């Protein structure tokens, strides 16, 4: 690469050795997961190519929704269907809460917009729902874990074997706390997160795997809830990130909210009814506005019709593409600020960008495409990859790299999104690792004491670009004590920052005089889940998995019994089957047993799977001997299936 930083070739070699040494111990399949705000996607690298996997409905993206209704947990497509019926019991957009504090400005805003209850649990936002008439709270990590578990199940269904390892993507501008919280979610889901990679970097892998000549690309990743921009240079299998910027609280959900606010005001003006007081009405509107937004990517006008949005009132309004663009114009243009920032950080002119790669469902919006094209002086963005699947595709490639799946020559060099440093006297932010430094990386700096005979130093670690620590984000702190008495400035305290391949920071301080040291892994600052909390959440997740399994078994057993009842009815009453061949007494015996079973089924809706299976056996014990007796008769029937035999397809 012409612009490659001087030390990069050495780093590439060490990275290759690092990857082969660390990742060679990983066994079994490794899947790639795009854990999105609104939708998630999973892929796997198999037989030399990436497969993006379908969910149970045949869709390649799955809603990041979890619902708790009538004691039953649903995840994905089924959960999203509950949103309009049970808005306070359906959880979504949890990516906007994960790794944040309860009083964060963005969380405060979301609390007023989301229909479910968000409560304060030791300074962290937790979600409160009712399960079996009891209030139950979940950390955002637990809800994300349920979505990850769903992705794992989709992969296991495709591969036909257990999956324990995954590469998971996060927004490039996720801070340390949000990254660690995402790893915790993976642990709760029973996954070993072998790598966390940035979403635009994953998309670049998807776009540029076959690129041999040096190519500079700008990845513009606008999803449902987050926005990232990265500049990368791809050269013969080496993917080097030069700069990254973004906004972890900007995306399609915000565009929807602008439209919703517009229609809420209009409805109140016409009907003197505030829809905000009715959570079900808001969810109905949210659903239709999202559909309208998608439609406006291909048409210029669409009608929104909601019958009985509130009692006695229908909703019928037209939304034009022009109005949608007007309502969101400032948000659309806000996305250009990170674009300008990465160009400045990478010291790139617009003309030096070879390709603009659009990623994320929101980049389908025509106005977004127009704004980007105009900003780059008429250059057409590349539309060669599926914006919904590109990130999962890249994550699957990274998974293949880790397993050594014909991708040994691909090297990924990502960067730190924010500057890392410590507080020194006067509240100064002393930088150790600057933003856009290639990772993994390590940096040491020597400090000293401020006062004579100072016995300890407090190491406070911050993240951000401001000169004073009060304007930056505190990641964590620890104390190094036992410093021998000495004059101010004499003790030598070496502070070492190490950022690993997942972008997670480790900090160590050592008194060079005594050799005494202390360190911490900076994770989710004071809000990080403890080991005990994670263990409990793993147990809770297993309990939910058991409950889901029991529910599936119950539904299956109930269906088997009901199918057998209907089959026996048809068998003895249909002239094409046994009606003309069976003796009257035998027919009455079967019909009587069938009626008893039907009545029992109607009166025992809460029966467990074992009781249902036993009832089926009891019914079979009455019916089967009669059916078998007829097999030997001339012109006798074909054998009837028992209730627990496999049939060609499940009933809907």
From Swiss-Prot:
It catalyses: ATP + H2O = ADP + phosphate + H(+). GO terms for molecular function: ATP binding; ATP hydrolysis activity; ATP-dependent protein folding chaperone. It is an enzyme of class 3 (hydrolase). Residues 630-652 are annotated as: Disordered. Residues 643-652 have a biased composition (Acidic residues). Endoplasmic reticulum chaperone that plays a key role in protein folding and quality control in the endoplasmic reticulum lumen. Involved in the correct folding of proteins and degradation of misfolded proteins. Acts as a key repressor of the unfolded protein response (UPR). This is Endoplasmic reticulum chaperone BIP. It comes from Plasmodium falciparum (isolate NF54). The lineage of its organism: Eukaryota, Sar, Alveolata, Apicomplexa, Aconoidasida.
């Amino acid at each position: 690469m012409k612009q490659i930083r001087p030390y990069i070739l050495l780093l590439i070699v060490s990275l290759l050795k690092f990857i082969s040494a660390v990742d060679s111990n990983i066994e079994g399949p490794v899947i790639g997961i795009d854990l999105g705000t609104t939708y998630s996607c999973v892929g796997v690298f198999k037989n030399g190519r990436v497969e993006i996997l379908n969910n149970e409905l045949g869709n390649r993206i799955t809603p990041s929704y979890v619902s708790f209704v009538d004691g039953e947990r649903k995840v994905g497509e089924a959960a999203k269907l509950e949103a309009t019926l049970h808005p306070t019991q359906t959880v979504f957009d949890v990516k906007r809460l994960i790794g944040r504090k309860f009083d964060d400005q963005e969380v405060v805003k979301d609390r007023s917009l989301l229909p479910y209850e968000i409560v304060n649990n030791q300074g962290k936002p937790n979600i409160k729902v009712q399960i079996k008439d009891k209030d139950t709270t979940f950390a955002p990590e637990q809800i994300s874990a349920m979505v990850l578990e769903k992705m794992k199940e989709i992969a296991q269904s495709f591969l036909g074997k257990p999956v324990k390892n995954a590469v998971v993507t996060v927004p490039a501008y996720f801070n340390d706390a949000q990254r660690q919280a995402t790893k915790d979610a993976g642990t709760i889901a029973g996954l070993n997160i072998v790598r966390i990679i940035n979403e635009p970097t994953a998309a670049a892998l998807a776009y540029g795997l076959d690129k041999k000549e040096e190519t500079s690309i700008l990845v513009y990743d606008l999803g449902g809830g987050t926005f990232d921009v990265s500049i990368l240079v791809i050269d013969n299998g080496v993917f080097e990130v030069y700069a990254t910027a973004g906004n972890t609280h900007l995306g399609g959900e915000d565009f929807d909210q602008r439209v919703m606010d517009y229609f809420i005001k209009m409805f109140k003006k016409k009907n003197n009814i505030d829809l905000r007081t009715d959570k079900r009405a808001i969810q109905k509107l949210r659903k239709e506005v999202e559909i309208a937004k998608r439609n406006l990517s291909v048409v210029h006008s669409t009608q929104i019709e909601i019958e009985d949005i509130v009692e006695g009132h229908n909703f019928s309004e037209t939304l034009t593409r022009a109005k949608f663009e007007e309502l969101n114009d400032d948000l659309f243009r806000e996305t250009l600020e990170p674009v300008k920032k990465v160009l400045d950080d990478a010291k790139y002119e617009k003309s030096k960008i070879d390709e603009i790669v659009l990623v994320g469902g929101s980049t389908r919006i025509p106005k977004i495409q127009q704004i980007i094209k105009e900003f780059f002086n008429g250059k057409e963005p590349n539309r060669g990859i599926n914006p919904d699947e590109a990130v999962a595709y890249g994550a699957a490639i990274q998974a293949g790299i880790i397993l050594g799946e014909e991708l040994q020559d691909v090297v990924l060099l990502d960067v730190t999104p924010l500057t890392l440093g410590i507080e020194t006297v006067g509240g100064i932010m002393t930088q150790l690792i600057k933003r856009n430094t290639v990772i993994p990386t390590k940096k040491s700096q020597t400090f000293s004491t401020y006062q004579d005979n100072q016995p300890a130093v407090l190491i406070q670690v911050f993240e951000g670009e401001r000169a004073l620590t009060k304007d930056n984000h505190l990641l964590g702190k620890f104390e190094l004590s036992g410093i021998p008495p000495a004059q101010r400035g004499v003790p030598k305290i070496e502070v070492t920052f190490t950022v690993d391949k997942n972008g997670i920071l480790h900090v160590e301080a050592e008194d060079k005089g005594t050799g005494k040291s202390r360190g911490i892994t900076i994770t989710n600052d004071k809000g990080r889940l403890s080991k005990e909390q994670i263990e409990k959440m793993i147990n809770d997740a297993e309990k939910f998995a058991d409950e889901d399994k029991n529910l599936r078994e119950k539904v299956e057993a109930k269906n088997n019994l009901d199918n057998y009842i209907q089959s026996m009815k048809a068998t003895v009453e249909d002239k094409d089957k046994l009606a003309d061949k069976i003796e009257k007494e035998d027919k009455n015996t079967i019909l009587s047993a069938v009626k008893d079973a039907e009545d029992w089924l109607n009166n025992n809706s809460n029966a467990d799977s074992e009781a249902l299976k036993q009832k089926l056996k009891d019914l079979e014990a009455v019916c089967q001997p009669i059916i078998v007796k007829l097999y030997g008769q001339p012109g006798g029937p074909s054998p009837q299936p028992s209730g627990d035999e496999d049939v060609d397809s499940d009933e809907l």
